[in-house]
């Protein structure tokens, strides 16, 4: 029952949903597999406002979300498609990493972005805005944060590095501007382990 309360819910009558992998193959509704969320139905748009081009892919609308669906049809959004980190053929949820890091008492805000990696394609880089009255040095907080993830996420999801910024850029509505962070750190070299 508690797990169901954590889900976003089920689709309404007349709407279908599915999750697909990078090759657009449908994934099982097992609550474990997650992929790009697609919907279709009478109440689903087929084109964006003031455009003539169809937004549909094989009659399905790509929501731009990454989700999983359990065997009861309960869906949970785990990330935005553009923010998921694809590492070694697996997907890492940036939102899960951000939520955990934000729980640390010295963290004001956390953003997790993908950094190019020669072996794994992408690896997570954690970008931290510290609270104004923080007590720890950057190195102390970095060490604490990397330990803070132990037991909370799969070990291979742990960010390869942590960097600190004065302010994480936000939109006018308060959403993180990950595009700006990706641009800022596009040449960043992850430490070799």
For the regions a language model picked out, list residue spans one by one.
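Conserved AMP-binding/adenylate-forming
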Residues: 1-74, 81-84, 97-98
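Glycine-centered tight turns that cap/initiate beta-strands
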Residues: 14, 106-109, 161, 167
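Residues embedded in well-ordered beta-strands
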Residues: 16-18, 36, 111, 125-127, ...
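Conserved beta-strand termini and adjacent loop/short-helix elements that scaffold enzyme active sites
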Residues: 20, 113-115, 165
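Short, ordered coil/turn segments that flank beta-strands lining enzyme active or ligand-binding pockets
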Residues: 22-23, 71, 87, 166, ...
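AMP-binding/adenylate-forming catalytic core of the ANL superfamily
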Residues: 41, 47, 66-157, 174, ...
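AMP-binding/adenylate-forming catalytic domain of the ANL superfamily
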Residues: 151-175, 192-193
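Acidic/polar alpha-helix N-cap and adjacent early helical turns
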Residues: 183-193
């Amino acid at each position: 029952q508690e797990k169901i309360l954590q889900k976003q819910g089920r689709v309404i009558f007349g709407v279908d949903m599915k999750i697909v992998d990078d090759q657009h193959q449908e994934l099982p509704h097992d609550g474990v597999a997650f992929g790009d969320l697609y919907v279709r139905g009478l109440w689903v748009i087929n084109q964006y406002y003031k455009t003539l081009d169809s937004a549909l892919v094989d009659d399905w609308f790509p929501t731009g979300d990454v989700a999983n669906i359990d065997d009861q049809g309960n869906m949970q959004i785990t990330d935005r498609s553009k923010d998921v980190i694809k590492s070694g053929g697996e997907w890492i949820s940036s939102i899960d990493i951000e939520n955990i890091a934000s729980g640390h008492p010295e963290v004001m805000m956390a953003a997790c972005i993908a950094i190019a990696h020669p072996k794994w394609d992408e690896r997570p880089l954690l970008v931290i805005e510290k609270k104004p009255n923080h007590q720890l040095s950057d190195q102390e907080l970095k060490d604490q944060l990397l330990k803070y993830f132990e037991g909370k996420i799969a070990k291979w999801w742990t960010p390869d590095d942590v960097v600190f910024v004065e302010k994480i850029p936000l939109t006018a509505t308060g959403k993180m501007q990950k595009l700006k962070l990706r641009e800022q750190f596009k040449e960043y070299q992850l430490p070799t382990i």
